[in-house]
Amino acid sequence: MQNKRNQSRVLWLLLIYITIGIFIYVGVNSLIGTPDVSKIEYSELVQMLEDKKIVSLEIEDSGYARARDNRGLYYETYAPTLLSDQQYVYGLANQGIEIKYVRSLENSWWISILTFLLPVFLLIFLFTFLFRSSGGGANQGMNFIKSPAKKYDPKKTRTTFNDVAGVKEAKEELTDVVKFLKDPKVFNRLGARMPKGVLLVGEPGTGKTLLARAVAGEAGVPFFYISGSDFVELFVGVGAARVRDLFNQAKANAPAIIFIDEIDAVGRQRGSGLGGGHDEREQTLNSILVEMDGFDPSIGIIVMAATNRPDVLDKALLRPGRFDKKVVIDRPDAEGRKDILKIHFRGKKIAPDVDLEVLARATPGFVGADLENLVNEAALLAARNGEKFITMKDCEEAIERVIVGPERKTRVLSEQEKEVVAYHELGHAILGTILPNADPVHKVTIIPRGYAALGYTLQLPSEDRYLMNKSEILDDIAVMLAGRAAEEIIFDEITSGAENDLKRATEMARRMVESFGMSEKIGPVAWASESEETFLARELFREKNYSDETAKELDSEVKQIINKSYEKAKSVLLENKEKLQFIAQYLLKKETISGQELRDLLQKDTDDLKEYVENLGVSSTQEEAKVVNYEYLSRENNLIERKGI
C-alpha cells in the first residue's frame, strides 16, 4: 500500500513538473533574443519604409509586423494590410528589404491544445486529491461518500454492564433492548414493538457512549459508532449519502446497533438556523428521518443516540416511531460514585488507607469522566513521587487538582496581596461556618492553584440533595459576597478579586426572581426563557415575554436581594471582626487550615484566640491540616469553589 502511494505521488509530481517546464519554455522562448520593441502606428511604419530606413520586416499570420531599421532598433505595429496586399510586399522585397513570414505563438496548435487541456488536468488533480484525502488511499475516491462509522466487534473489544456503574436505572431501562437484540422473535411473537431509536440524555462525561457499547456487548452484536459532525462535509449531499451507507452497513450486519454521538450536531430544529432552510445539515437530518422510517424493526437494528442538549432537537426526531425511548443518565450519587471508583481502581496498586467511601463522599457532582481523571491523576502523582502504591494522600491531592488545578509554586504573591487574599477567603469561610443554612467549610487556603485562583474556600454538602429552599439560597449568596465584604471592612477598599463571586451571586439572585418565584414583590411567576442554554438561532428571533416595566421590576428585585445579602455578610463579619483578624494571622502563618480547625477557632473567645495565635509559632515541620472533603460550587452542578482573587 505504501509503495502504491509513493508511485502515485511520483506520477503527480512528474505531471506538475512537466506543466511548469512547458510554461517556462514558452515564456523563455518568447522572451530570449527579443530586444526592446517600440510600439508605433501603421502610418509611421509606411513612412519609414518610404524613407528606406527599414532593413528587415517580419510579418506574423496574426496581422502583427515587426520591423528593424538601419540603426538596429525594433518597431512593432498591427498591419493586416501586409497580409492581403502581396504586390506591395513584393515591391518592398525588390527594394532590398528582408521579408520574413512567421507563425504567431498564439496560433500554434500545441499551445492551443495545452491551453485547453491544462485547466482540465488541474481540475482532475484537485478532485482526485480531495477524494483520496477523504478515502484514505489510491482507487478509493468513492470512500468520500461512504460512512466513516467505526465498527466495534463485541468478540474483540467487549464492554458489558459490569464495566458501567452509577447508572442503575439506565441499565434497567436498556435491559429490554438487550433482550430484543438477542432474540427479536420473542417480542415479535407477542406483538410487542421495540423502539426503533433510543435517545441517551445526560451531561458530558456521564457515560452515554460507554453505556451504548455495553448494550452492544451484552447483546453480542456489532456496534457502529459515528459522531453527528462526521455527516456534514464540504460538498452538498455527502451527509445524506453517508447516512444511507451507514444504515446499509448495519442492515448487512443485523442485528446491530447504530450509535450517533452528539446527534444535536445534525438534529437541531429545522428552519431555525442562520443557514436557511435547505442547508447541508437539514438534508442530513431528513435522510436520518427517512431511514428510520424505512427499515423493518423485526430485523434487529436499534439506533441509539446521545446528546446533552435535548431542548434543541427537532421534534420530528422525538416522535413515536423514531427516538421514542428516552433514557436519562444523571450524575451519580455517593453510592454510584463509589461503584465507579471501584471500576477505575481495578488493576491498580492501592495502599490500605485508601477509603473509597470517603472519596465518594468527597466528590459530590463528579461524573464518571471526572472520577476516571481523578484516579489517573492519583496514579500519576504516586509514580512521580516514586511510591509503590497509590495512597489516600495522592487521591486527596488528585481531587484538588481536578477541581482547581495544580499548585502554582512559581506564582509568588507580595505580603500585601497575601493578606488581602487571606481576609477575602476567611470572609467566605466564616460566613459559611456561622450561617445555619450554608454548606460546611472543609478547607481554606491561600496557596495559588490553577489558572486564576490565588486562594479558595472549599465547602461540601453534608449529603446529596436535589432541592434548595429560599433560606439556603440566600445564605449561599451571602457567602459568595462575604469575600468582598471582608476586604471592605478590613482595608476600607475593594479589589477585583470578587469578580467571579459577583457573577455567581447575581446569577443566583436572578434565578430566584425569574425562575423560582421567590420574590415577594414579583410573586410566583416564571419569567425566564425555556432554556437556560444559549442557542444563537433562537435567541436572535425570540421576543421577551414581559414588558420593559416588568424588566425594571425584575432588575430591581435582583439588586435588592444582592444588597440585602451583602449587608447581611458585612453584619456577621463586623460582629466577628476581631476573630476575623486573629484567624487571618493564623491563616497567613499556616497557609492552609481545615474546616474543623476553623470551627474550633471560632468557638474560642477573643482573648483566648488572640493568645493562641500569638503563641502559635508554627514551624516548617508542623503537619498541615489534613483535608479529606472537597466540594462543588452549588447544587446546580458547578464547582463549590470560592475563588477569592
UniProtKB/Swiss-Prot annotation:
TM region positions: 12-32, 111-131
E.C. numbers: 3.4.24.-
UniProt entry tagged with the keyword Membrane: yes
Topological domain spans for side Cytoplasmic: 1-11, 132-645
GO BP annotation list: protein catabolic process; proteolysis
Residues where ATP binds: 202-209
UniProt: Zn(2+) binding residues: 424, 428, 501
Oligomeric and partner information: Homohexamer.
Protein name: ATP-dependent zinc metalloprotease FtsH 3
Organism per entry: Petrotoga mobilis (strain DSM 10674 / SJ95)
